[in-house]
Amino acid sequence: MSESVSKSSQPLASKQEKDGTEKRGRGRPRKQPSVSPGTALVGSQKEPSEVPTPKRPRGRPKGSKNKGTAKTRKVTTTPGRKPRGRPKKLEKEEEEGISQESSEEEQ
């Protein structure tokens, strides 16, 4: 009886080893580089000195943090087109708004 137990444990261990080598990770499997006959001919025709174009960088450009503040940029609105977003208050309008609020409280 002890012999049968030892025999059953050995095949299980060997199966786990095989599975472990076949299925490593849970993620997406890596794409295997396949060489088709059509692409092999094109590759041999290319010049070895030709450098492939590098991929464009993603995300924010490196120097974008060093831009000037919003005050230095001049916003030009074309006539006949509504400005987008919340309208900006000018200093004159802010003073008028304060004076109107105080007069309403008095009444």
From Swiss-Prot:
Residues 93-107 have a biased composition (Acidic residues). It comes from the Eukaryota. Residues 21-31, 53-63, 78-89 bind DNA. Residues 15-24 have a biased composition (Basic and acidic residues). There is a cross-link at residue 15 (Glycyl lysine isopeptide (Lys-Gly) (interchain with G-Cter in SUMO2)). The modification Asymmetric dimethylarginine is found at residues 26, 58, 60. Residues 1-107 are annotated as: Disordered. Keywords: Acetylation, ADP-ribosylation, Chromosome, DNA-binding, Isopeptide bond, Methylation, Nucleus, Phosphoprotein, Repeat, Transcription, Transcription regulation, Ubl conjugation. The modification Phosphoserine is found at residues 9, 36, 44, 49, 99, 102-103. The modification Symmetric dimethylarginine is found at residue 26. Residues 1-13 have a biased composition (Polar residues). Residues 53-77 are annotated as: Interaction with HIPK2. Pfam families: AT_hook. The modification ADP-ribosylserine is found at residues 8-9. It is found in: Nucleus; Chromosome. The modification Omega-N-methylarginine is found at residues 26, 58, 60. The modification N-acetylserine is found at residue 2. The keyword Transferase does not apply. Interacts with HIPK2. Belongs to the HMGA family. HMG-I/Y bind preferentially to the minor groove of A+T rich regions in double-stranded DNA. It is suggested that these proteins could function in nucleosome phasing and in the 3'-end processing of mRNA transcripts. They are also involved in the transcription regulation of genes containing, or in close proximity to A+T-rich regions. This is High mobility group protein HMG-I/HMG-Y. It comes from Rattus norvegicus. The lineage of its organism: Eukaryota, Metazoa, Chordata, Craniata, Vertebrata.
